[in-house]
Amino acid sequence: MALSPAAAGRTGRNNNNDAGLADPLLPAGGGGGGGKDKYWVPADEEEEICRGEDGGRPPAPPLLYRTFKVSGVLLHPYRLLTLVRLIAVVLFLAWRLKHRDSDAMWLWWISIAGDFWFGVTWLLNQASKLNPVKRVPDLSLLRRRFDDGGLPGIDVFINTVDPVDEPMLYTMNSILSILATDYPADRHAAYLSDDGASLAHYEGLIETARFAALWVPFCRKHRVEPRAPESYFAAKAAPYAGPALPEEFFGDRRLVRREYEEFKARLDALFTDIPQRSEASVGNANTKGAKATLMADGTPWPGTWTEPAENHKKGQHAGIVKVMLSHPGEEPQLGMPASSGHPLDFSAVDVRLPILVYIAREKRPGYDHQKKAGAMNAQLRVSALLSNAPFIFNFDGDHYINNSQAFRAALCFMLDCRHGDDTAFVQFPQRFDDVDPTDRYCNHNRVFFDATLLGLNGVQGPSYVGTGCMFRRVALYGADPPRWRPEDDDAKALGCPGRYGNSMPFINTIPAAASQERSIASPAAASLDETAAMAEVEEVMTCAYEDGTEWGDGVGWVYDIATEDVVTGFRLHRKGWRSMYCAMEPDAFRGTAPINLTERLYQILRWSGGSLEMFFSRNCPLLAGCRLRPMQRVAYANMTAYPVSALFMVVYDLLPVIWLSHHGEFHIQKPFSTYVAYLVAVIAMIEVIGLVEIKWAGLTLLDWWRNEQFYMIGATGVYLAAVLHIVLKRLLGLKGVRFKLTAKQLAGGARERFAELYDVHWSPLLAPTVVVMAVNVTAIGAAAGKAVVGGWTPAQVAGASAGLVFNVWVLVLLYPFALGIMGRWSKRPCALFALLVAACAAVAAGFVAVHAVLAAGSAAPSWLGWSRGATAILPSSWRLKRGF
């Protein structure tokens, strides 16, 4: 698969043809780029014209990205519909308050509170999308300005914990894609943080460094995409567009593929070789009889052992830093010509490899290691002593670089003369491989990434989502953006020992990071092997180093909240920094996502629980300072408070139970016709708004529909669990939401690829949604039985019909959940429909039978009429809140 040629209609002022970069929201070659697209129009043309009319002044630096806004043809109706719907919701709430139901005031007040809450959350969600902006980087201008030696350094952080739950092959592919990316080898460094201190990861990284000596020059020579070998060899071959002859390319490709298969075999063998090596060693035991896990040279591994022992188990082990690949030097180094022992010709290829470092921070009992945030902060300090690049990229271990131009694209925003200095981070969307074709559990989450984040891009910038993000190092250190920084503030003022710890070598790197905007510093290149230097590196990742400092609070990634990503981005925005959103075609990065229902729900539980932790902490968006823009504050309030909707959603979904215990009394807002008219209007308008949003965001109806369905799935179970957990945490002092590593599975053949989709892992998280489904199925069956028995008045028929529509709609929204708990039977969706029909029929038959028995002896009790009011007071806005 060769590097894709530039799209014919790629966006850009200079008709540049940088391979791999096209309009963020349009397929390559689709419609002449963003500037000519009918939904997006340039927003910075006047600024560019003014810059061209310099009036004899020195020419201003060129703009490194273009800004586009939604055309007024779509944007004005979108805003108007939002305003009209807001007015309709206000009028509806006022009408409901005026027409009170005195027969069931307690339930009426609950429904009023629910409708008000849903109206507020819808407004919070919608307000941040009223000014969507997309920005398209110009790579050709970046190359002309900085490829002569001015490109800044980039440190890349990769995080992993378990080589089984997070397959090591994914992690090593991520590293290979980073080493091979289209960026000068002497200007970027890769750091693997192994929070499990596994010898398998360490030796796997050794194998990866060896294979990289072949893979990286091959990628540079033939300009292949993507540069993660697993994805590259799995993709369908595209026409070759590299500089070599096709025959040479295909010969090289066969050799590299064979070497890659051997590399994978060596990785797999580590899981048997390491235990066998340790078992075979004579006298291999510590004083307590535990067998040590041995490295290849026979010495005990300082990290975790296969047989846990004191100081060698999870949560208790020494810190480890190993430099796998040292600094390559600044001058290109050409490879060897083809020979009998080296069949690939690299004589015209720069074969240098970037710095590669293995890190396992120290862990000891009695210390809270702060999970991913703690690991990232340790990487931040270690990298400062070894490479100290001014910019940092972070990846999860299951993500890889899919577009080798991604680093350059992010720098277009960081180095632009308009807002570059005030930009703290550039966020890329998350895209995933091996998600089922219908995206049953909304893993792609396109409504959030392609609509909500584009909306925030027009305010202060998108939120940080945990991976695929470039940071400015000094912003993470807690510095203020230049526009908020006093003129007499020197970068050296950042280096306060009480704030950053007692390592003076580390503190001395902070001013250097603040001042190096265009060149990489490699202070450790000549001293990586010196004992004192490495001792200092080990010191900054000890457990006690952060005691009495601001790490995890005002410095680095934020601690004590499960969603450390969102709260860290919020801290930067609160200080006045901006962020930028960058989507590319082809996608900049791709990763894996949980396609099993239970794993996906646990992932959502961590997100929703962490959001509530943030809302009820001192990082609450409502308490932020004046530097946070009002609309950005609104967006963060929406991101952190949305799980509360579950309280009202569950009440609405369980109304049939309420009426079963309420003697069959039927209450609905009167006058009925006016109520239904309002209800239809407010729901219909949100559907129309959604259709307009689909147009400008480049979504599909399936994307939008899956978002609606999974919001209901989350609200009936996971969000409720998050709310209850936070309540218990406040009342009983429980710990925060427990971090559960989302297990990933290696993709197998066609039969195994989606095997996890059909596995049922029963968990308490499934129970609430199962109950909601059962209640609504029972309501439908009981209503059918009541219809057979007869005895309804016309008014009751109208009310029951409205209730049945609601019951059916709840089941339609929970359809993906129902498939998930059916396991392998979900391969035949018709079985689900047959099961639901049979369940409703069974309930109806039971209702009729009980009614007949009781009617034969005496009058039927009042509770048999409960089904007529199964959903008596319908929620007016029960599905107005989008996103999760």
Swiss-Prot record:
<keyword id="KW-0808">Transferase</keyword>
<feature type="transmembrane region" description="Helical">
    <location>
        <begin position="802"/>
        <end position="822"/>
    </location>
</feature>
<feature type="compositionally biased region" description="Low complexity">
    <location>
        <begin position="1"/>
        <end position="27"/>
    </location>
</feature>
<feature type="binding site">
    <location>
        <position position="396"/>
    </location>
    <ligand>
        <name>substrate</name>
    </ligand>
</feature>
<dbReference type="GO" id="GO:0000139">
    <property type="term" value="C:Golgi membrane"/>
</dbReference>
<protein>
    <recommendedName>
        <fullName>Probable mixed-linked glucan synthase 9</fullName>
        <ecNumber>2.4.1.-</ecNumber>
    </recommendedName>
</protein>
<keyword id="KW-1133">Transmembrane helix</keyword>
<dbReference type="GO" id="GO:0030244">
    <property type="term" value="P:cellulose biosynthetic process"/>
</dbReference>
<dbReference type="InterPro" id="IPR005150">
    <property type="entry name" value="Cellulose_synth"/>
</dbReference>
<dbReference type="GO" id="GO:0071555">
    <property type="term" value="P:cell wall organization"/>
</dbReference>
<feature type="active site">
    <location>
        <position position="195"/>
    </location>
</feature>
<keyword id="KW-0328">Glycosyltransferase</keyword>
<dbReference type="InterPro" id="IPR029044">
    <property type="entry name" value="Nucleotide-diphossugar_trans"/>
</dbReference>
<feature type="binding site">
    <location>
        <position position="398"/>
    </location>
    <ligand>
        <name>substrate</name>
    </ligand>
</feature>
<feature type="transmembrane region" description="Helical">
    <location>
        <begin position="672"/>
        <end position="692"/>
    </location>
</feature>
<dbReference type="GO" id="GO:0005886">
    <property type="term" value="C:plasma membrane"/>
</dbReference>
<feature type="transmembrane region" description="Helical">
    <location>
        <begin position="830"/>
        <end position="850"/>
    </location>
</feature>
<dbReference type="GO" id="GO:0016760">
    <property type="term" value="F:cellulose synthase (UDP-forming) activity"/>
</dbReference>
<feature type="transmembrane region" description="Helical">
    <location>
        <begin position="104"/>
        <end position="124"/>
    </location>
</feature>
<feature type="transmembrane region" description="Helical">
    <location>
        <begin position="765"/>
        <end position="785"/>
    </location>
</feature>
<keyword id="KW-0961">Cell wall biogenesis/degradation</keyword>
<feature type="transmembrane region" description="Helical">
    <location>
        <begin position="640"/>
        <end position="660"/>
    </location>
</feature>
<dbReference type="GO" id="GO:0009833">
    <property type="term" value="P:plant-type primary cell wall biogenesis"/>
</dbReference>
<keyword id="KW-0812">Transmembrane</keyword>
<feature type="active site">
    <location>
        <position position="565"/>
    </location>
</feature>
<feature type="transmembrane region" description="Helical">
    <location>
        <begin position="708"/>
        <end position="728"/>
    </location>
</feature>
<keyword id="KW-0472">Membrane</keyword>
<dbReference type="Pfam" id="PF03552">
    <property type="entry name" value="Cellulose_synt"/>
</dbReference>
<comment type="similarity">
    <text>Belongs to the glycosyltransferase 2 family. Plant cellulose synthase-like F subfamily.</text>
</comment>
<keyword id="KW-0333">Golgi apparatus</keyword>
<feature type="region of interest" description="Disordered">
    <location>
        <begin position="1"/>
        <end position="34"/>
    </location>
</feature>
<comment type="function">
    <text>May catalyze both beta-1,3 and beta-1,4 glycosidic linkage on beta-D-glucan. Essential for (1,3;1,4)-beta-D-glucans synthesis in grasses and cereals (Poaceae). The mixed-linked glucans (which are not present in walls of dicotyledons or most other monocotyledonous plants) are particularly important constituents of the walls of the starchy endosperm and aleurone cells of cereal grains such as oats, wheat, rice and barley. They can account for up to 70% by weight of the wall.</text>
</comment>
<feature type="transmembrane region" description="Helical">
    <location>
        <begin position="73"/>
        <end position="93"/>
    </location>
</feature>
